[in-house]
UniProtKB/Swiss-Prot annotation:
Record key words, sorted: Antibiotic resistance, Cell inner membrane, Cell membrane, Cell shape, Cell wall biogenesis/degradation, Hydrolase, Membrane, Peptidoglycan synthesis, Transmembrane, Transmembrane helix
Organism lineage string: Bacteria, Pseudomonadati, Pseudomonadota, Alphaproteobacteria, Hyphomicrobiales
Transmembrane segments: 11-33, 46-66, 84-104, 107-127, 144-164, 185-205, 213-233, 246-266
Disulfide bridge partners, by residue number: none
Gene Ontology MF annotations: undecaprenyl-diphosphatase activity
Protein task: Catalyzes the dephosphorylation of undecaprenyl diphosphate (UPP). Confers resistance to bacitracin.
InterPro entries: UppP (IPR003824)
Homology family: Belongs to the UppP family.
Protein's membrane topology: Multi-pass membrane protein
Reactions performed catalytically: di-trans,octa-cis-undecaprenyl diphosphate + H2O = di-trans,octa-cis-undecaprenyl phosphate + phosphate + H(+)
GO cellular component, as recorded: plasma membrane
Localization: Cell inner membrane
UniProt protein name: Undecaprenyl-diphosphatase
Record's miscellaneous remark: Bacitracin is thought to be involved in the inhibition of peptidoglycan synthesis by sequestering undecaprenyl diphosphate, thereby reducing the pool of lipid carrier available.
Length: 268
């Protein structure tokens, strides 16, 4: 039993790390896996801490860039504007997420069919956007104007619906607002840092009375898998989307969403 629990923890950590930064909805995948496979033994502490593994993955890959930003911040106006832009983009999710946290977790997260619908809708949107003949105006995340950042931030709030995808909403929003594919994915990475850290801190605070570290081995295994797989995705995603776009992720969403919907209709 312990061995299978460790496999479960490794699998869930792997899914979290692989899907957190690509536009397929990590939350949607984890909810469907939990519903169909009954993976519930890991508990709230596990859920919170594998998110931390994904957060540390992106921070480790971007550590050199973050250090350079911190060094340039006092003397470079462009760097200060970029940091302000990321914070501006983060604000809508911070405010709306805090206000609607109970509804999101208590209602939306209990609806597997909604997850499947959102996966399918998001898949069609990704395929549509990937085929558009867009003429990007912004090729560097440092050059995003503040109004564009704010608009991306509001679009990110759609990801509070499970199955939408935080990275998917920000990437599609960035593309439609004039960014090229590489910078759209990279801005999604930067925006993930405060958004995921804020969500992690808020979940940790809300769950402080029920957290338990009794299953320490499961938590460690899930955390490590989320970290390793997250590092892999962050290191390779920008080059991939620059060459191939987002069609693969669109098709993946359609397959998973359709299969999940069929399974719900047949087995419930």
């Amino acid at each position: 039993m312990v061995f299978f629990n460790l496999l479960e923890a490794a699998f869930l950590g792997l899914i979290e790390g692989l899907t957190e930064f690509i536009p397929v909805s990590s939350t949607g995948h984890l909810l469907l896996i939990g519903h169909f496979l009954g993976f519930e033994s890991t508990g709230k502490t596990f859920e919170v801490l594998i998110q931390l593994g994904a957060i540390l993955a992106i921070l480790s890959v971007y550590s050199a860039k973050l250090a350079r930003i911190a060094t340039d911040f006092p003397r470079d106006a462009r760097t200060r504007r970029f940091v302000l832009g990321v914070l501006v983009a983060f604000l809508p999710a911070a405010v709306i997420g805090a206000l609607a946290h109970g509804f999101i977790k208590g209602v939306l997260f209990e609806t597997p069919m909604l997850v499947c619908i959102m996966l399918i809708v998001g898949g069609f949107i990704l395929l549509w956007v990937d085929q558009l003949n867009l003429r990007p105006r912004y090729h560097n995340v440092m050059d995003y104007p503040l109004p564009i950042c704010l608009a991306i931030g509001f679009i990110q709030c759609l990801a509070m619906i499970p199955g939408v995808s935080r990275s998917g909403s920000t990437i599609v929003g960035s593309l439609l607002l004039g960014a090229d594919k590489r910078s759209a994915a990279e801005f999604s990475f930067f925006l993930a840092m405060p958004t995921m850290a804020g969500a992690f801190a808020y979940d940790l605070f809300k769950s402080r009375n029920i957290l338990s570290f009794n299953d320490g081995a499961l938590i460690v295994v899930g955390f490590i898998m989320a970290f390793i797989s997250g590092v892999f995705v962050v290191r390779h995603l920008l080059d991939y989307v620059s060459r191939h776009g987002f069609a693969l992720f669109g098709w993946w969403r359609l397959i998973v969403g359709s299969a999940g919907m069929a399974a719900l209709i047949i087995w419930g």
